[in-house]
Amino acid sequence: MSRFSQKDRSQPGAAAAQVQAVEAAYVALMRAQRWLVGMLVACAIIGLKLHGPPGVLGNRIYLPAILATSLLTLAFTLRGRLVLPSLDELRANPRDAMLLRRWSRNTLIVQWLCTAVGLTGFALQLLGAATSLALTLYAIAFAYLFMLRPVRP
């Protein structure tokens, strides 16, 4: 008998408490995602009201698109290299608090990178870029926040 199963027999509530900790972390990550989506909606509305003068960016519209593409590439890379391996480890050992923190932190980083794409659209609105370009970046940010949402361990 392993020492973990002996610990479960000596402390029957410990395993249930760890499952609750994992569930609480998942709920907190989903709450953070909803907050980020709400922030992007608020930025879109504020950006429509405070639209900057046209022509500030000139022909440099491609630079924010390159930045947004780089951020999404980084988000996908981090998800594959950090989030998914820590998720697999967490599923194998849900009682490890370090794994839970690592999974939560890495998932938050990926969510913030996706949100940064939408904030790029907000910056474009303030600099006077076309509204369609900014709204496209918001839509991409919403789509990637949905696609890269936290996975329940």
Predicted features along the sequence, with ranges:
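Short, hydrophobic transmembrane alpha-helix segments
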Residues: G47-G58
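Alpha-helical transmembrane segments
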Residues: G58-T73
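Short membrane-interface loop/juxtamembrane segments of multi-pass integral membrane proteins
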Residues: L90-L113
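Hydrophobic alpha-helical transmembrane segments and immediately flanking/interface helices
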Residues: Q125-R152
